[in-house]
Amino acid sequence: MTIKVGDKLPDGTLYEMGEEGPKPVSVAELIKGKRVVFFGLPGAFTPTCSALHVPGYVAQADQIKAKGVDEIVCVSVNDAFVMGAWGKDQKVGDKVRMLGDGSGLWTKVLGLELDLIAKGLGLRCERFSMLVENGVVKSLNVEAPGKFEVSDAATMLQQLDKR
């Protein structure tokens, strides 16, 4: 079952690269009492993700946060080492938090698992964006396969303007 607007965002453990290696991040703790924008994508260092998706959120992070968003989080089915290296490559700084769902378990719980086995990429995350307020999904934008039209930073900004 896929997560939908009005649902409570399920807890899970994601990982980010810290000074001493990967460190766990509880989704429940991350969103508690906060307004958080999540965006998920199929993979680090892939063309659309690297050329458009992440750079869009980095470029518009200040505008998004000015709308009352506490944090912007990028999630991918990659490990913390890859997400950390990709964050440096994308120059995210403190604008976007790069969290890995290495096992894909949280992605699966959300119902946003993308099967790319036939393309040699394994099980990944669908491309999406989501606004979560105090643990509840307020907006959710899931892309059609192969598309990049509704999960971008500009769309999220428009949705934040309406809230």
Indicate where each model-derived feature is located.
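Chalcogenol-based redox active-site neighborhoods
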Residues: 1-163
